[in-house]
A protein has these predicted regions:
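Core beta-strand elements of the Rossmann-like FAD/NAD(P) dinucleotide-binding domain
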Residues: 2-4, 251-260
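N-terminal Rossmann-like FAD-binding beta1-loop-alpha1 element of flavoenzymes
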Residues: 4-31
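Short hydrophobic core segments
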Residues: 9, 32, 236, 255-268
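Conserved flavin/dinucleotide-binding core of flavoenzymes
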Residues: 16-17, 25, 195, 245, ...
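Glycine-rich FAD pyrophosphate-binding loop
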Residues: 23-48
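Active-site/ligand-binding neighborhood in enzyme catalytic cores
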Residues: 131-235, 243-245, 264, 274, ...
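Conserved beta-strand-loop-beta-strand element in the redox core of flavoprotein oxidoreductases
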Residues: 240-256
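Flavin (primarily FAD) binding-site architecture
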Residues: 263-281
C-alpha cells in the first residue's frame, strides 16, 4: 500500500466501490459517512416476523454485469422477482389483465397499440443515437434538451392511452412528472439502461432479479472490508483544498486529510457542502439544477401472497394514483406475502403532506383496487419517505430539467482541482441505478489512482 490516501465522502454503493477499487490499486482510502449505516439509497428493514424488506434500491437485471460480478465476489446470491401469472393494467377507465410474458406493453385496441408502438419505436431510434459519454453532443441535442419530455409525448403520440403509458413510465423510472425533465435526459437515460421497455420490464429487464437478504448486504459486506477506515455518523461540512492536499471537516470538527477526495453524494447534496476555495460557477450552477425524484416506498404485509393463488403476479400499472406501480416483494420462501408500491412524483409530494395513517389508508385502497378485498387488512404496514431523508432528500436519482445537459453536462464529472465526483448520476452506463453507482465509483477510483501514481 502506498503512502497516498484518498478521502471518500459517502458510504453508498459508489463510495464503497471507489474505496474498494482504490485499495486493490494500492492506495489507502478512508470513507466518511453522515448516516449511522452504510448503503446510501439502499436500505434494509425487517417485518415483524424478521423477513427482510428493501426500503430503497433493490433490483438487478441483464447487462448490469458489474453488479452480478460484485454479488458473486461478496458471496451473495440473487433470486428472480416473482413474475408468474398476469399483471393488472389500468389506463383510463378500463382495468384489464395482461400476461406477464408480454413484457412492458399491455394489450390495447389496435389503433392505440399502433400509436404506442410507433411512439416507442421513434423514442428508441432517437435514444440509441445519444452518446452515453457526452449526451450534450447528440444530434439535435439543443432541440431535445430545450423541450420537456411531456412536450415530446404530446407531439409524437396521438391517443390519450398511449400518452398515459409514457407518462406513467416517466413516473416509474424517474419518480418525476414528464413535464419535469428534458426529452434529451429521458432518451439518454433509457439508452444508458438499454431501452425504455427494458427499464420497465421484469424478465430480461431492470427488475429481473433481487438479492437474497436485501441489496444493502452488498454495502455491508464492502464496509466490513474497510474496518476502522469507515467512519459513520460523520456528516461532512466542508471540503478544503490547497493545491496539494485536501481536508474534509465534519460538523463536529473532525478532520480527515488526503491527497484527493471523491465526493459521492447526490449532486444537490454535494452542492450544499462548503468548499474552500468556493466551487467554480459552472459546477455550483449544475448542482442547483439537479433535483432528486419524489418517492415514498410502501409495503403491506400479509400472511401469504394471496394474489398468486388468483393467478396474478402482484404487479399493477395504472395512470391513477396515488400508487401507480406495485410489485410482489415476498421473500424466496413465498411467505409472508409482501406487497410493495410506490407513491411517486406529484402523488409522492402530495402524500408527504399526509400522516402515516392517511398514507396507509390510501395505499391499502390502491391495493384493494388492483387485487381485491383480500388486500384490505394487512398485518403490517411499512414505509420509507425518501424525500424526508436528510442525507438523500429524494430518490431514485437526480433528473435533468430542460437545458441542463447542454449547458452544464461536462461539469457532472469534471474534477475541481483535487475534488472528484462519483455516484449513480455520474455513470454513462445504467445511470441512476445501483450498477451505475458501482461503475462510477470504480471508474473514478481508477482516474484518481492514475493521478497519484
Amino acid at each position: 500500500m502506498s503512502d497516498r490516501q484518498v478521502v471518500v465522502v459517502g458510504a453508498g454503493l459508489a463510495g464503497l466501490s471507489a474505496a474498494r477499487r482504490l485499495r486493490t490499486l494500492g492506495i489507502e482510502a478512508i470513507v466518511v459517512e453522515a448516516r449511522s449505516r452504510v448503503g446510501g439509497r439502499t436500505e434494509g428493514g425487517l417485518t415483524a416476523d424478521g423477513s427482510p424488506v428493501e426500503l430503497g434500491g433493490q433490483w438487478v437485471g441483464p447487462t448490469q454485469t458489474r453488479m452480478y460480478e460484485l454479488i458473486d465476489e461478496l458471496g451473495l446470491e440473487t433470486f428472480p422477482t416473482y413474475n408468474t401469472g398476469k399483471h393488472v393494467v389500468q389506463l383510463g377507465s378500463s382495468q384489464t389483465l395482461m400476461a406477464s410474458h408480454r413484457g412492458a406493453v399491455p394489450k390495447l385496441n389496435p389503433f392505440v397499440l399502433a400509436d404506442l408502438f410507433q411512439g416507442l419505436t421513434r423514442f428508441k431510434r432517437i435514444a440509441d443515437r445519444v452518446p452515453l459519454d457526452k449526451p450534450w453532443t447528440a444530434i439535435d441535442a439543443k432541440a431535445l434538451d430545450g423541450q420537456t419530455f411531456e412536450t415530446w409525448i404530446v407531439r409524437h403520440l396521438r391517443t390519450s392511452t398511449a400518452r398515459a403509458y409514457f407518462r406513467v413510465a416517466a413516473e416509474a423510472v424517474f419518480s418525476a412528472e414528464s413535464c419535469n425533465l428534458s426529452a434529451l435526459h429521458a432518451m439518454f437515460y433509457a439508452h444508458s439502461g438499454t431501452d425504455l421497455e427494458g427499464l420497465l420490464s421484469v424478465d430480461r429487464g431492470a427488475q429481473q432479479d433481487r438479492i437474497v437478504g436485501g441489496s444493502v448486504r452488498i454495502s455491508e459486506r464492502m464496509a466490513a472490508e474497510l474496518g476502522e477506515r469507515l467512519h459513520l455518523d460523520c456528516p461532512v461540512r466542508q471540503v478544503e483544498q490547497d493545491g496539494s492536499r485536501v481536508t474534509v471537516t465534519t460538523r463536529d470538527g473532525r478532520a480527515f486529510e488526503g491527497d484527493r477526495v471523491i465526493v459521492t453524494l447526490p449532486p444537490t447534496l454535494a452542492g450544499r457542502l462548503v468548499y474552500r476555495p468556493i466551487l467554480p460557477s459552472w459546477r455550483d450552477q449544475l448542482t442547483q439544477r439537479l433535483p432528486a425524484g419524489s418517492v415514498i416506498k410502501l409495503y403491506a404485509i400479509y400472511d401469504e401472497p394471496f394474489w398468486r393463488h388468483e393467478g396474478l403476479t402482484g404487479q399493477a400499472a395504472s395512470d391513477q394514483g396515488p400508487i401507480k406501480v406495485t410489485f410482489d416483494n415476498s421473500p424466496p420462501s413465498g411467505a409472508p406475502g409482501i406487497m410493495m408500491g410506490f407513491m411517486e412524483a406529484d402523488d409522492g409530494r402530495a402524500a408527504a403532506r399526509l400522516s402515516s395513517t392517511e398514507r396507509r389508508e390510501a395505499a391499502v385502497d390502491c391495493f384493494v383496487r388492483y387485487f381485491g378485498p383480500k388486500a384490505a387488512n394487512p398485518l403490517e404496514y411499512i414505509e420509507r419517505d425518501w424525500m424526508a431523508e436528510e442525507y438523500s432528500r429524494g430518490c431514485y436519482g437526480a433528473h435533468f430539467a430542460p437545458g441542463v445537459w447542454t449547458e452544464y453536462g461536462p461539469a457532472l464529472t469534471e474534477p475541481v482541482g483535487l475534488i472528484h465526483w462519483a455516484g449513480a448520476e455520474c455513470s454513462a452506463v445504467w445511470n441512476g441505478y445501483m450498477e451505475g453507482a458501482v461503475r462510477s465509483g470504480e471508474r473514478t477510483a481508477e482516474v484518481v489512482a492514475d493521478e497519484l501514481r
